[in-house]
Amino acid sequence: MACNAPNQRQRTLSTSGESLYEILGLHKGASCEEIKKTYRKLALRHHPDKNPDDPSAAEKFKEINNAHTILTDTSKRNIYDKYGSLGLYVAEQFGDENVNTYFMLSSWWAKTLFIIIGLLTGCYFCCCLCCCCNCCCGHCRPKSSTPEEEFYVSPEDLEEQIRTDMEKDMDFPVVLQPTNTNEKTQLIREGSRSYCTDS
């Protein structure tokens, strides 16, 4: 398609945000009512059904309709007023809510900041080692300020602890047998719970 029209210029994205207003013949701060009135007037004048002999009328009508669609949508209009047609393109690609973030990250100071941090950290290699890998999988991590005590339990001490726990459990025998249950038995009874056997 580009080979057929070598003299046709590729349309560039503007950042001024004025060309849609110029299509409708309005100034940049026009109200919604002015936009609607002008759109109706121009749409009737350039409608393809009213101008069947003029092939450019259909193209002009599409431009007018596109300008009206964008300028009557408040979020698209705010993006267009602030960033121009480039902002609308970014909104299509990344969403309306991410337009400000895109332009902030593509500003000169953000790019400069990324380059400086990248150079200072050795292409972010230091950040990766310190934050992600904790310097060689934890071998070089900084020592904690509180010393960790060595905790060792001998098998004899462990056996003695188990024996004393079992003896304590033998002091309180089970006096109630479990009740029969079926599918309709509730797992948790209504009312107060009692874990005491003295009742």
Curated annotation (Swiss-Prot):
It is a lipid-anchor. Signal peptide: none annotated. The gene is Dnajc5b. PROSITE patterns: DNAJ_2. Palmitoylated. Residues 19-84 form the J domain. It is found in: Membrane. It comes from Mus musculus. The modification Phosphoserine is found at residues 14, 16. The keyword Phosphoprotein applies. Its main location: membrane. SUPFAM superfamilies: Chaperone J-domain. This is DnaJ homolog subfamily C member 5B. One of its GO terms (cellular component) is membrane. Keywords: Chaperone, Lipoprotein, Membrane, Palmitate, Phosphoprotein. Interacts with the chaperone complex consisting of HSC70 and SGTA.
